[in-house]
Amino acid sequence: MTDMRRLGQRAKQASLLIAPLSTQIKNRFLSTLAKALVDDTQTLLAANQKDLANAKEHGISDIMMDRLRLTSERIKAIAQGVQQVADLADPIGQVIKGYTNLDGLKILQKRVPLGVIAMIFESRPNVSVDAFSLAFKTNNAIILRGGKDALHSNKALVKLIRQSLEKSGITPDAVQLVEDPSHAVAEELMQATDYVDVLIPRGGAKLIQTVKEKAKVPVIETGVGNVHIYVDAQADLDIATKIVINAKTKRPSVCNAAEGLVIHEAVAARFIPMLEKAINQVQPVEWRADDKALPLFEQAVPAKAEDFETEFLDYIMSVKVVSSLEEAISWINQYTSHHSEAIITRDIKAAETFQDLVDAAAVYVNASTRFTDGFVFGLGAEIGISTQKMHARGPMGLEALTSTKFYINGDGHIRE
């Protein structure tokens, strides 16, 4: 028996042991964990420093280092996310509907756990805690497989969670970490149909594509963030400037950062110089512009076809000038990763049309795409942002980690 199968068996058994846990027990434990994270900050930072040192040795960019880095403030924010999950209403056992049918059977449809969730993710160590807290609150066991660049951080975080579970009299196998970073073991997890009820990949395009191709277990696809901002003919250009700067430069390495800028030709000649001047005072950006946009910049390079479909995760942005709202919507729907999209406009009808017709999990009017986040949406720490339409879409909070079951009660009923 392989290590992966042993781990899967333990997770399956743990899912049965934690299935009956009450809301009170779960919330009390999550509050305990939130405190333990803060109390153990120095240990967690020391482990993270090992990952940062390894990343530096391998020439990882500053932007990607930021995804990997833990700080005291970030650990405090992770702990706050755990506490927020504790404070949320428990969906498990929630009655979705109840009725008596024509045969006199009493039928209830309730929310129940999924069972065992597997999570494959990349650099960010906070995902370990975020994913566990949501899985635990919904009575699911979870198997975590992080990237090798965050292995020391993930080991320290999962060790803390397991120790906290054990101290609380709860099976520590409710969370398990796959420490082997090999692709072979990852593929074994993707195909563990005997143990894994659902797999959630969270990372870049290559990871998502690999999971889609290799997985035999059900997958909830979380998306790459090829995110666009459309500046409409009726846009307030001051607001547009502020939003583009925020969405592109605040944290370019995250999936809700903007990667593409689409501008109506009626405002392009005014807006582009205005934006370029303002953004250069904050953080210069490399503009990859189409033929109409290129001469309007002081500094830009001609866009290649692949630039319009790339999640840069860097201070780089593609630029497209369009002649109508319809062309903007068509362009965005061609290149979107179905994550988050935004329109800047004072035209209410244009805003409504954009929100109705753009195919994305979150569609904004006059706001930065950086708000697409489970914590911001009031869902607690998110397990990922789903870009598919089946089961869950957008930031996935507690309900996304549940299924439903029908409970039918009779009194000797038989079907004639």
From Swiss-Prot:
It comes from the Bacteria. It is an enzyme of class 1 (oxidoreductase). PROSITE patterns: PROA (PS01223). GO terms for biological process: L-proline biosynthetic process. The keyword Transport does not apply. Gene3D superfamilies: Aldehyde Dehydrogenase, Chain A, domain 1, Aldehyde Dehydrogenase, Chain A, domain 2. Keywords: Amino-acid biosynthesis, Cytoplasm, NADP, Oxidoreductase, Proline biosynthesis. InterPro entries: Ald_DH/histidinol_DH, Ald_DH_C, Ald_DH_N, Aldehyde_DH_dom, G-glutamylP_reductase_CS, Glu-5-SA_DH, GPR_dom. Its main location: cytoplasm. Its EC number is 1.2.1.41. Pathway: Amino-acid biosynthesis; L-proline biosynthesis; L-glutamate 5-semialdehyde from L-glutamate: step 2/2. It catalyses: L-glutamate 5-semialdehyde + phosphate + NADP(+) = L-glutamyl 5-phosphate + NADPH + H(+). It is found in: Cytoplasm. The keyword Ubl conjugation does not apply. Pfam families: Aldedh (PF00171). One of its GO terms (cellular component) is cytoplasm. One of its GO terms (molecular function) is NADP binding. HAMAP family: ProA (MF_00412). Belongs to the gamma-glutamyl phosphate reductase family. Catalyzes the NADPH-dependent reduction of L-glutamate 5-phosphate into L-glutamate 5-semialdehyde and phosphate. The product spontaneously undergoes cyclization to form 1-pyrroline-5-carboxylate. This is Gamma-glutamyl phosphate reductase.
